A protein has these predicted regions:
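Membrane-proximal, glycine/serine-rich, low-complexity loop/turn segments characteristic
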Residues: 15-278, 289-295, 444-452, 667-674, ...
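Exposed beta-strand and adjacent loop surfaces of beta-rich binding modules
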Residues: 11, 174, 374
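A generic structural signal for short coil/turn motifs at secondary-structure boundaries
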Residues: 3-8, 185-189, 430-432, 560-564
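Exposed, low-structure sequence patches enriched in small/polar residues
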Residues: 116, 142-144, 264-334, 338-686
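Sec/Tat signal peptide C-region and signal peptidase I cleavage site
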Residues: 8-14
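Cleavable N-terminal signal peptides
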Residues: 1-2, 12
Length: 686
């Protein structure tokens, strides 16, 4: 029986939000770490009879659940986040991202983050925040079947559905299924989005703890209409005649027959980008080691197993399709002329990829009493087949690629938990991406309870530019051929965390050469010079009075040298509000005001045809601070979010009074006015 009100042992008391896994090179599980966080505990052997008694006293915990999860590249067990102050924990777009006016549209990070990935990459990342990924797959362990349903409704029929179910089929075998739908017609013409994502994963471990099996299926189907931004021949945003923003003319998708849709489950995109991907991963491990046991009493023995040598094989199969299409092109529009489209027939560009990868690795655990110290060595063979096509080509152009790489990793978290060392690297020995590499090292130390944790590290990546920069890509429309050298990215990073002060100070210093980028709607370029960029981030939580809190994040960014990168000097996000229970034992609530702001800068423009943000140095974005009010609360397993966003867009004077003073996400791409969102998430246990 589903229980709407139950005590979730771990869910109700966990306060610390689990951090998302750090992106690994290639997002390839074969190259990611898989540590053993503790000695493997076997099933408890108990010879005593445990018969049931229908008349026994109920404790109130019969409907409780203990649930933990881990990621593929780590054995550290984590618990659900029960805090309610951060809406982005349930919303796909992080707070430090901007999206093009409609949830589901292309999005980018305001905080500069280069692509830290060696080897092959297709090159289409504008919709990455909406994808389910391999790295974020959670492998659960639960004492009872657990389900979670979520529904979010926003202005202009914005909707999001979230479904999660996990259960242990056996004590040593768990399976989980997750689905998410994002659908939004948008505020402006030809802006609708429809994204479907699902994930199935399973984790099995033999009773003797020697064999482990990880299985993942992830698929995404993303569809987003593209309008090219609003037209600028008239001041439409300031005109009282266009207070209804859907009446403002746009640059793409305006030909008769290309009508907007508001069908909830429709995926009918006439002019826009359609991306899809499918991943299947099977990882198998077999351990050799030492047995042990703990004798609890005369009748109970807990068997233990300490791995000393591990053999691992990871198989990955993936299919990826990236397509722009326009069923009703209009060659008279300036944007088409700029891109060189002169046809009245349906137009499309497409890259399709199929990947098969096999990885073999060996782990050794030097210290029996410290399973979090290990050395990993391995090699992988990657086979790629691509097909590139457009409406102007004679037909699909096939291409096959292969890569052979070696990789290694060392990790050591000392038993006193004062030191944590991590180092990994991969090197492409042969193939189409030979000489690509990625090297990383990080040291973390607990200085003292007063000072906190200090981390310092270095990373260097030598990578071939993404395949969208290759002349063979179906998205290559430039008349002249061009070759690109390997990019080199060096990164020095560090952080200081002080839990007592609820503060974290971090910094990144980038040194980049041969940076490949887009500098126009359909033009690629490479900066041969060397430039650097410095980032400093301060995160701090202040107590104003009792339960009144102020959470603040401030990011400072500065470039030097010939940098084809524009970033705001300062970005900040602040929350000021109440966090507590208002005297009710089962209530947890947070309400107050949220503010986001960045200093004026020349933000990247967007190419709808390429699905890429590109560098521009002519238009300066000067936005007012984003202001919103929020009321979030949790009652046992029911969670709700009520939000009023973009209050800063209210215009007090003139004939265009109302929420019409829109901010810009990119040149010619305005954000919405007032936006109301209501989301509910409910957990159930069987």
């Amino acid at each position: 029986m589903l229980a709407g009100s139950f005590a979730v042992t771990e869910l109700a008391h966990a306060q610390v939000r689990p951090t998302r896994p750090r992106p690994r090179p290639d997002d390839v599980p074969a190259q990611s770490r898989n540590t053993t966080g503790s000695a493997q505990t076997g099933n408890v052997k108990n010879t005593r009879s445990t018969g049931t008694d229908s008349l026994r006293h109920r404790t109130g915990l019969e409907d409780s659940i203990t649930i933990t999860f881990r990621y593929l590249d780590s054995s550290a067990l984590q618990r659900f986040d029960s805090s309610v102050h951060d809406f982005t924990s349930r919303f796909p777009v992080p707070a430090h991202y901007v999206y093009l006016g409609n949830v589901g549209a292309a999005a980018r990070n305001i905080i500069f983050t280069p692509l830290l990935r060696s080897g092959w990459d297709a090159g289409f990342h504008a919709f990455d925040v909406y994808r389910f990924t391999l790295n974020e797959t959670r492998f659960y362990n639960t004492t009872r079947p657990y389900s979670e349903l979520g529904y979010l409704l926003g202005s202009k029929a914005e909707q999001m559905i979230h479904v999660l179910h996990t259960q242990n089929i056996r004590p040593n075998w768990n399976a989980a299924l997750q689905y998410r739908l994002i659908n939004s017609p948008g505020y402006f013409q030809n802006q609708n989005t429809n994204h479907n994502s699902y994930r199935f994963n399973s984790y099995y471990q033999s009773r003797n703890k020697r064999y482990s099996n990880f299985f993942i299926i992830v698929a995404n189907k993303l569809a987003a209409s593209e309008n090219g931004g609003i037209r600028t021949d008239l001041p439409y945003l300031d005109s009282s005649s266009f207070q209804e923003r859907s009446g403002i003319p746009v640059k793409l998708g305006t030909r008769p027959g290309n009508n907007n849709f508001r069908d909830f489950f429709s995926n009918n995109i006439h002019t826009g980008n359609k991306y899809s991907d499918f991943y299947l991963v099977l990882r198998q491990q077999y351990d050799l080691g030492q047995k042990d046991s703990i004798i609890v009493n005369d009748t109970t023995v807990i068997p233990l197993f300490y791995p000393r040598l591990r053999f691992e094989h990871t198989f990955r199969l993936s299919n990826q399709t990236y397509r722009f299409e326009d069923s009703y092109p209009d060659s008279s529009l300036p944007l088409y002329q700029l891109y060189g489209i002169d046809t009245a027939h349906p137009f499309y560009m497409q890259d399709k990829w199929k990947e098969i990868m096999n990885d073999f690795s060996i782990y050794t655990f030097p210290d029996r009493k410290n399973p979090q110290q290990f050395l990993k060595l391995g090699a992988a063979l990657q086979n790629l087949s691509g097909s590139f096509d457009s409406s102007k080509s004679a037909g699909p152009r096939p291409k096959t690629l292969y890569n052979f790489l070696v990789h290694g990793e060392y990790r050591n978290r000392t038993r006193n938990k004062k030191w944590e060392i991590e180092a990994f690297g991969n090197f492409y020995v042969a193939g189409n991406y030979a000489a690509d590499y990625d090297a990383y090292i990080s040291l973390k130390r607990l200085i003292s309870p007063t000072i906190g944790f200090l981390q310092a590290g270095f990373r260097n990546i030598n990578r071939t530019p993404s395949f969208v920069f290759d002349v063979n890509s179906g998205f290559w429309k430039e008349r002249a051929t061009q070759s690109f050298n390997k990019e080199n990215i060096s990164m020095i990073f560090g952080s200081l965390e002080q839990p007592r002060l609820r503060m974290r100070l971090s910094g990144n210093y980038y040194l980049i050469s041969n940076y490949a980028y887009f500098n126009n709607i359909n033009q690629r370029a490479q900066e041969s010079g060397v430039f650097n960029l410095l980032q400093l981030t301060l995160e701090k939580q202040f107590t104003i009075h009792k339960n009144w809190q102020w959470r603040s994040m401030v990011v400072l960014q500065q470039t030097a040298g010939p940098a084809p990168v524009n970033v705001p000097l300062i970005f900040t996000r602040n929350q000021v509000g109440y966090e507590g229970n208002l005297g009710f034992r089962n209530l947890r609530t947070a309400f107050g005001m949220e503010l986001r702001y960045h200093t004026p800068y020349k933000a990247d423009a967007y190419s709808p045809f390429m699905g890429q943000f590109y560098f521009q140095d002519t238009t300066r974005i000067n936005n007012t601070p984003d202001i919103g009010l929020y009321l979030h609360f949790r009652i046992k397993t029911f969670m709700a979010f009520v939000r009023a966003e973009n209050l800063n867009t209210y215009r007090f004077a003139g004939s265009n009074t109302g929420f019409t003073n829109n901010n810009l996400a990119a040149p010619d791409y305005p954000m919405p006015g007032l936006q109301i969102r209501v989301g509910i998430f409910w957990s159930f246990v069987n």
